[in-house]
Amino acid sequence: MIPAIQRIHHVAYRCRDAKETVAWYERVMGMRYTTAFAEDTVPSTGEHDPYMHVFLDCGGGNVLAFFELPNQPEMGRDPNTPAWVQHLAFEVADEAALHAAKAHLEAEGIDVLGPTYHGIFRSIYFFDPNGHRLELACNIGTAAQRVELAALAPVMLEEWSRTKRAPRHAEWLHKEPEAVAPLR
């Protein structure tokens, strides 16, 4: 068995321009640029493919990294996956922080979707300059709701696996608070 994973070390995505990406994440997201690797040869494969690999501190020991690959074809999206599926979500402290973040992003000229209610958290969505969808989320759920969802998770996955239709066991998740039925 694999030893216990301690945490995610970093998450890496491709970018169009490393300098522009670092500047955007520092200015817009308040992240700190910490490290850069640049090589002409990929250490793991030995391939000749020059790259710049930049790392940003997201806070809480979390690291976001990007690769600029100037010799590769222009980056694109997976044409078979909707844009809303692949995204990176960051947590903010509370709803006030979420609303402040939305105002900040809009002041930067960034289109923001939301806040969207997800039962146990609220989110806003937007894109970085590379086309990566980002989410800022704040937790609003109760301990009882998290316990209920944990108990339902195996049942829901099994039902989905059999039917490929959304199970209704936790449909309260996307109803606004005044419409949410009491917990069982």
Report residues per predicted region.
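Core segments of cupin and vicinal oxygen chelate
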Residues: 14-63
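Short, well-ordered beta-strand micro-motif
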Residues: 55-57, 68, 127
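Short glycine-/small-residue motifs
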Residues: 63-66, 136
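Vicinal oxygen chelate
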Residues: 6, 17-20, 71-73, 81-83, ...
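Histidine-centered active-site/metal-ligand motif
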Residues: 9-10, 48, 53, 64, ...
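Short, extreme N-terminal leader segments that mark the start of a protein/domain
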Residues: 1-16
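A short, acidic/glycine-rich surface segment
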Residues: 40-44, 71-77
